[in-house]
Amino acid sequence: MKSSVEKLSETRVKLNVEVPFEELKPEIDQAYKALAQQITIPGFRRGKAPRQLIDARIGRGAVLEQVINDMLPTRYQQVVEENELVVLGQPHIDITKLEDNEVVEFTAEVDVRPEITVPDFSAFAVEVPALKSNDEAIDAQIDKLRERFGELKDTKRKLKTDDFAIIDIEAAIDGEKLEEATTEGMSYQVGAGDLIDGLDTALRGLKAGESAEFTTTLKAGEHEGKEAAVTVTVQQTKERKLPELDEEFVQTASEFDTVEELRESIAEQVAEQAKAEQATAIRDEVLKAALAEATFELPEGVVEDQIHAQLHQLLNQVGGDEAALNAALEAQGTSREQFDADNRKNSEEAVRTQLFLDALAEQEQPEVSQQELTDHILFTAQSYGMDPNQFITQLQQSGQIGNLFSDVRRGKALAAAICRVSVKDDEGKAVDPSEYFGEEEESAEESE
């Protein structure tokens, strides 16, 4: 077999392959054997008909078609390996010459990973937010717990932010009442801001039995974008009374006995969350710096595949209905054009990041243990809300376990590189990235 590689661009090559027929004997033998099992020729047992009779019955062309189908994947892969190409996606293959008993020639165009120069991470210096005092965060968590056990009490005063109200709403356009925008006896928290623009402003200062009128622009439904006159009437006003923060409440609302124990537990949770956020900030800043340093061309075919995959995923959520997708986007205050632009930008960023991390992993050569791979598979299954055994079965059937292995490998490579970066917080204090990304902290999730 003869082959050559023609460079079409930094990210695409064309393989020219010539295979003499004498090298195709295994595929030819297998093709005749398979076809002999599929046809019946009088006087011969199934599978025993001679080749010339098979040619006469179905034509030599059918045999050659089978041979071509069998030989293309293996010969293509052989050329890829011989030339040490890192191919991306599926090739576009054309049979350019077929001379029976002489030669088969074909070309294969395919995207390849561009040359990527991995920068020196030890030269990077990044700044991240400092770990702040967590008293406010602790108090906020305790208040959330108190709110879960709070009681709504009737009031006679004017409504203010965070109060609750039982309200009636009526909307009209040009004096015509809109049934779909009319409701009675609805509970609403003032300041929620998730119903109608202008509603919170109208409610503040009202008492039970009072009404207010305002004009708003409808953001969804048949009359989306139109101006509507809205009347809101308050039936009842309520405020949430929070329980006292004492031992009785703590014992009712948690597994702890004292307020001090509750605060200590929440403080630990808040501190861990703050550290996780700082670790994420370090990772993001380092990766941003590395990608800015390592500029390279993106393979357009891979980007297009990513764009189509994201679009397909979103379309599945609306039953594959393009019109429904466009309507949903408009309801969110955007457009299909903006979505497509954002999708392309995000897809390019995703492809650029993955290609860079693959190059980094080749440089770092991290080892991935079976336990690390298993942990990542279990973590991913949990994130999808799937049974781990069912998830593993799906991975095996679709041949996707290798992708998760690559996720872990990329994560470990990036973790090792981050440990060489100089990190300070925005208060000027040095931060040791190995506390987050050292060997004992490495995990598959760091690649997410």
From Swiss-Prot:
UniProt entry keywords in alphabetical sequence: Cell cycle, Cell division, Chaperone, Cytoplasm, Isomerase, Rotamase
Lineage top rank: taxon: Bacteria
EC numbers for this chain: 5.2.1.8
Catalytic reaction annotation: [protein]-peptidylproline (omega=180) = [protein]-peptidylproline (omega=0)
Acidic residues bias spans: 437-448
Gene3D superfamilies: 3.10.50.40, Trigger factor ribosome-binding domain, Trigger factor, C-terminal domain
Pfam family, one: Trigger_N
BP GO annotations: 'de novo' cotranslational protein folding; cell division; chaperone-mediated protein folding; protein transport; protein unfolding
Annotated ranges, domain PPIase FKBP-type: 162-243
GO cellular component: cytoplasm
Compartmental location: Cytoplasm
GO molecular function: peptidyl-prolyl cis-trans isomerase activity; protein folding chaperone; ribosome binding
Region: Disordered, residue numbers: 426-448
Protein family membership: Belongs to the FKBP-type PPIase family. Tig subfamily.
Function: Involved in protein export. Acts as a chaperone by maintaining the newly synthesized protein in an open conformation. Functions as a peptidyl-prolyl cis-trans isomerase.
PANTHER family in alphabetical order: TRIGGER FACTOR CHAPERONE AND PEPTIDYL-PROLYL CIS/TRANS ISOMERASE, TRIGGER FACTOR-LIKE PROTEIN TIG, CHLOROPLASTIC
Xref: HAMAP family: Trigger_factor_Tig
Domain comment, as recorded: Consists of 3 domains; the N-terminus binds the ribosome, the middle domain has PPIase activity, while the C-terminus has intrinsic chaperone activity on its own.
Full protein name: Trigger factor
Gene: tig
